[in-house]
């Protein structure tokens, strides 16, 4: 779809001059150079994003949760009933799920988006971008057509950009869908070139005696559909799912506005791999929240070149890790904007020079 290609070509480059200025500012704060570690690096990364205009700050916050069912559930790769997707999506509208509680704590709004739940009628309270009642069974057919993937990508990109126009400056991504770690593993295996046995995990507490079947399903899906690892849309359409496409769309939409996206867990890593194949320019806008406990997490993150800020043994999904990490983003902005400067008190510390302080 040409409109997507045109939009991806307009993703702004990171402002290296703004990052250099931010580095000098951070080095001149009331502290030894580097003593706030990754918070300093995060503040400098944010300063380089054109959407924040050189000064790290957080306006409105939003977690976009993509909800969809998966045909591959029929292969016995998940123990939860498929109906749980719809039930939990409805619970999200009541604010009672994990991501909703954590997002409320962070002061973020949760946008629950139906991109492919298998119900006869749309669920009240959800944003309706449904493509179909669940994706195809990737063990026997593609997840969707390329046209469906591109249309959903564009819809989510446009929705994300509209939120940015309305003041959202920090995005988080999440998902909801029974059996969705299976297509996620297929994406990770395809793009990283690693064998499914290395990336397939237990998902939502799959018994270990069923893991061999899940690995076999992922291997069959890749062999049958032959996704092109260099083509992110092709990978998503052939072995992905509507929720994974939606997450990729948020990343592309936010990056096109020069704004950061907090990743969540394994599903978001898989979507990020596909999105970065579409546009490597989005990578500096991706901020990893936590290390998922899912087996292939480190493989995916290593391929992305990302190191998460938290390691909480979490694997809930939903965007829970992204919501939890929003306070870290705000902390990085706070030190940048609110700490005093050494030069104002005529303090020179080892590692700081007078020229540094006055620059």
From Swiss-Prot:
Keywords: Cobalamin biosynthesis, Glycosyltransferase, Transferase. GO terms for biological process: cobalamin biosynthetic process. It catalyses: 5,6-dimethylbenzimidazole + nicotinate beta-D-ribonucleotide = alpha-ribazole 5'-phosphate + nicotinate + H(+). Pfam families: DBI_PRT (PF02277). One of its GO terms (molecular function) is nicotinate-nucleotide-dimethylbenzimidazole phosphoribosyltransferase activity. Pathway: Nucleoside biosynthesis; alpha-ribazole biosynthesis; alpha-ribazole from 5,6-dimethylbenzimidazole: step 1/2. SUPFAM superfamilies: Nicotinate mononucleotide:5,6-dimethylbenzimidazole phosphoribosyltransferase (CobT). InterPro entries: Nict_dMeBzImd_PRibTrfase, Nict_dMeBzImd_PRibTrfase_bact, Nict_dMeBzImd_PRibTrfase_N, Nict_dMeBzImd_PRibTrfase_sf. It comes from the Bacteria. The active site is at residue 318. The keyword Metal-binding does not apply. Its EC number is 2.4.2.21. Belongs to the CobT family. Catalyzes the synthesis of alpha-ribazole-5'-phosphate from nicotinate mononucleotide (NAMN) and 5,6-dimethylbenzimidazole (DMB). Homodimer. HAMAP family: CobT. This is Nicotinate-nucleotide--dimethylbenzimidazole phosphoribosyltransferase. The gene is cobT.
């Amino acid at each position: 779809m040409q409109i997507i290609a045109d939009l991806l070509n307009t993703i702004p480059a990171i402002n290296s001059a703004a990052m250099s200025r931010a580095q000098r500012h951070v080095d001149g704060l009331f502290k030894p150079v580097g003593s706030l570690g990754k918070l300093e690096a995060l503040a400098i990364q944010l300063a380089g994003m054109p959407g924040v205009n050189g000064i790290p700050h957080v306006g409105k916050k939003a977690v976009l949760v993509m909800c969809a069912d998966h045909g591959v559930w029929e292969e016995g790769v998940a123990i939860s009933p498929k109906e749980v997707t719809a039930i939990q999506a409805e619970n999200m509208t009541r604010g009672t799920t994990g991501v909703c509680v954590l997002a409320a704590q962070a002061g973020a709004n949760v946008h629950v988006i139906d991109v492919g739940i298998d119900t006869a009628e749309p669920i009240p309270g959800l944003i309706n971008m449904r493509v179909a009642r669940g994706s195809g069974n990737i063990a026997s057919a593609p997840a969707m057509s390329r046209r469906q993937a591109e249309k959903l990508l564009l819809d989510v990109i446009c929705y994300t950009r509209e939120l940015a126009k309305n003041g959202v400056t920090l995005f988080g991504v999440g998902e909801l869908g029974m059996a969705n770690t299976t297509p996620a593993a297929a994406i990770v295996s395809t793009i990283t070139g690693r064998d499914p046995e290395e990336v397939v995990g237990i998902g939502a507490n799959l018994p270990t005696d069923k893991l061999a079947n899940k690995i076999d399903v992922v291997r069959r899906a890749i062999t049958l559909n032959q996704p092109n690892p260099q083509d992110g849309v092709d990978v998503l359409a052939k072995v992905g799912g509507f929720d994974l496409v939606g997450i990729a769309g948020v990343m592309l939409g936010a990056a096109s506005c020069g704004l950061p996206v907090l990743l969540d867990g394994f599903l978001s890593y898989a979507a990020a791999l596909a999105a970065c194949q579409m546009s490597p320019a989005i990578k500096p806008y991706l901020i990893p929240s936590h290390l998922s406990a899912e087996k292939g997490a480190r493989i995916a993150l290593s391929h992305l070149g990302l190191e998460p800020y938290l390691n909480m043994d979490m694997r809930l999904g939903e965007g829970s890790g992204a919501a939890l990490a929003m306070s870290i983003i705000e902390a990085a902005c706070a030190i940048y904007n609110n700490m005093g400067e050494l030069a104002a008190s005529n303090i020179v510390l080892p590692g700081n020079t007078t020229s540094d302080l006055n620059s």
